Amino acid sequence: MDTTKTEEQFKRVMDECRTLFAKKLHDYGASWRILRPSSLTDQLFIKAKRIRSLEITGTSLVGEGIRPEFIALINYGIIGLIQLEKGCVDTVDIKPEEALALYDAHAKECLELMLRKNHDYNEAWRDMRISSYT
């Protein structure tokens, strides 16, 4: 099984997600460091519900589509992994460079896990309905 295409696609999407993460990090700093795991899982829930709503109704009154919500799911997921690793705090305690390094480390772990699972499951996810994720 050749997973070169999958790895390239993953990296392209992660570049897009990281770019947005870096922009928000520049604007707001690592303000998410104060969020508890329950706050982050609520954000993931809200994004998944919005995707489902857009899929079912086909209507967005705020003018944003589904793709930004999937990007948010990825970024909130990585933020969640960072928070689980470092714990939540009462004040921002990391600089943008450290936040990006943590982001990159977790994104790399996700890629490596995906490649291992792709081997074992023969990329079965490619045959799944996208709505299975929401």
Where do the PLM segments sit?
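Intrinsically disordered, low-complexity regulatory regions
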Residues: 1-134
